[in-house]
Structure formats: C-alpha cells, structure tokens
Regions:
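Short, well-ordered alpha-helical segments
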Residues: 77-81
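N-terminal alpha-helical interaction modules that lie
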Residues: 1-74, 90-131
Length: 131
C-alpha cells in the first residue's frame, strides 16, 4: 500500500470521526455486537448480516441492504452505518477491486448516509480525485 492510499484511508477515517463528533458526541465510532446472538437487537442483526455480506465479497449487496434497512430517526443506525464504512475502509485495495467497489464509493456512502440524517457539508472533506 502506497503513501497515497494510506493518506486516503486516514482521511476517510477522519471524516467518520468528524461526523461521529458532530452527530453522536463521540470521538471514535465503533458499533459493537453483543457477545451472544440471543442478546442481539434488530439493529445488531442488520449489522451482522451486512458484515457477513462484506466478508463474502458482496459489498454492493451489503450497501444495498444498509440503505433498505436504514432508519434515519435512530442514531444507532448512523453509528452502525459509519462503523460498516470504517470496516470497508480497512479492506485492502485488491479486496475492494474484486468486489467491484472503491474507496470513492466508501466516501460517497458516508456522505449519503450522513445526508439521510441531516448531516451535510462534508462532501469535499476527502479528495476523491486521489482515489
């Protein structure tokens, strides 16, 4: 991974942290699942399904499912979505490429989900021409 890729990944992480501070009052964002499935909420089940799709290389399907299940009135869904995009950001470029996905799409997804929650103004935070 080159310096440019590392820079873009860090900038995406900074974008998510800025949204977390603004919308959730948190310095870091990390939607964590309970230890056992019997303790899962509906949101936990959605997140688990999304992660399973990503791990199977079905990133576009995971993103489609995210939008279908997103509740713009529940900030837990914002945290879940941002955590998912952070997870995608940690994937290497080859994995993203094999899934027909890109870092630019990560940025677009972050901005789109944020806009669903009324959070705007970050559209130019990441220079996607470097992606």
């Amino acid at each position: 991974m080159g310096y440019q890729d590392d820079y873009v990944m860090r900038t995406i992480s900074d974008l998510v942290r800025a949204i977390a501070r603004l919308a959730l009052g948190k310095n870091e964002i990390n939607y964590a699942l309970p230890d056992t499935e019997d303790k899962y909420s509906d949101t936990d089940r959605i997140y688990r399904k999304l992660r399973d799709l990503v791990d199977a290389g079905e990133i576009n399907e995971a993103e489609n499912q995210l939008y279908e299940n997103l509740d713009e009135n529940d900030t837990e869904h914002l945290e879940m979505a941002m955590t998912l995009y952070m997870y995608l950001n940690q994937l290497d470029d080859d994995t993203l490429f094999m899934a027909n996905y890109s870092r630019e799409e990560i940025v677009e997804g972050i901005n789109s989900v944020s806009a669903s929650f009324g959070i705007t103004g970050f559209e130019n935070f990441v220079d996607t021409t470097m992606v």
